[in-house]
Amino acid sequence: MTGFALLGHSFEMAQGSGCTVHIQSRNVPFHPEAWEFADMGFLPAGAYRNRDYAETGVTVRNNVSRTMQDLLYDPQTSGGLLMAVDAADAEKCLRELQDAIPQAAVVGYVTERQENWIILE
């Protein structure tokens, strides 16, 4: 991912595919200190630009905290890899990725288009 962070890139993937991406925030891996700094409000300006760009395409459910949302818009998550794979192949793909990248995780799923491009849960 480049500077659009997880939500920005998910937003672009969803629009480009005409589908809805469901992000399960509890499954997104972070560096241990990231939460602490975001909770104190230490965010780069790019996080606010990313929010401005994508937030109309994001529906937040299940009381996802503002801190979690901030982290998911944070461009410092750059360098990650966002992949969409068939659900039937997800576990096998994850196991293979985790051999090289232990923190790799399934962070969501894709459905046909719903009320918005991204559903953040």
PLM feature segments, named:
Residues 1-121:
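Glycine-/charge-enriched secondary-structure boundary and capping motifs
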